[in-house]
Curated annotation (Swiss-Prot):
GO terms for molecular function: 3-oxoacyl-[acyl-carrier-protein] synthase activity; beta-ketoacyl-acyl-carrier-protein synthase III activity. Gene3D superfamilies: 3.40.47.10. It catalyses: malonyl-[ACP] + acetyl-CoA + H(+) = 3-oxobutanoyl-[ACP] + CO2 + CoA. Homodimer. Its main location: plastid. Pathway: Lipid metabolism; fatty acid biosynthesis. The keyword rRNA-binding does not apply. This is Beta-ketoacyl-[acyl-carrier-protein] synthase III. Residues 253-257 are annotated as: ACP-binding. The gene is fabH. The keyword Lipid biosynthesis applies. Pfam families: ACP_syn_III, ACP_syn_III_C.
Amino acid sequence: MGVHILSTGSSVPNFSVENQQFEDIIETSDHWISTRTGIKKSILPLLLPSLTKLAAEAANDALSKASINAEDIDLIILATSTPDDLFGSASQLQAEIGATSSTAFDITAACSGFIIALVTASQFIQAGSYNKVLVVGADTMSRWIDWSDRSSCILFGDGAGAVLIGESSINSILGFKLCTDGRLNSHLQLMNSPSDSQQFGLTTVPKGRYDSIRMNGKEVYKFAVFQVPIVIKNCLNDVNISIDEVDWFILHQANIRILEAIATRLSIPLSKMITNLENYGNTSAASIPLALDEAIKEKKIQPGQVVVLAGFGAGLTWGAIVLKWQ
């Protein structure tokens, strides 16, 4: 049994922050941000962001394009590291879109989350467990940023992307590879804050609060530039497809310098990489499905083309998927 991508969808907040606006908050400039990251503006909410509502808008967009009712979905997988509820927001998403017949759960793998979620969804379909699965990658990074840290606050934006997949006699997912190295976890993390505590009898119990994102940019850059080309090449080798036979590469939209370095290591022109980083910033788990949806809207991706998706991020985790677009 194969897996077919039925439709895609996306959603972003309706407020953008231009690079120049950061100059009033921190010591930086539009030139510094754009040359080092490729970002020209980020998308942030005017009010308190709702992960669930962003995810629901992307999900409904995908459902509408496929002319499928939410009640017909068997499973929802929400890839996010910033849920509205610490226990997970997939159930809230299920309720929001009215997918009352579906099972729903979250996957937390930061910027690799969508890749892992899509692979997980495909396994359920290939096993014959479910017929239609909705995969959503969504993050509201704005609420976990230290806005005084210029190394990280300029990078992130909020957004959501969705992919609806179903069973088919033809398999659109040709192969995949997933990787993790927990020894590198400290390079990118959002940890529990030990500063708050409460007294319980003779015991002091920490309160459940978290710090802001902390990132070692140099180490993350080295990790991504080294590991991502390897996992892409290995994945392509497994399905007997050469780099030259790939029509498009859609990578996690982290930083333009990372994407340029990966393109160089793969010996491919940057024009083969679909990017939207300059308009949204790093939207974490949303970045790949958001870029995929835009590429389809713009008719860049055509039937029969080979597309490589690759994510990398906190964990540290990374992975790749090879698609044959149908």
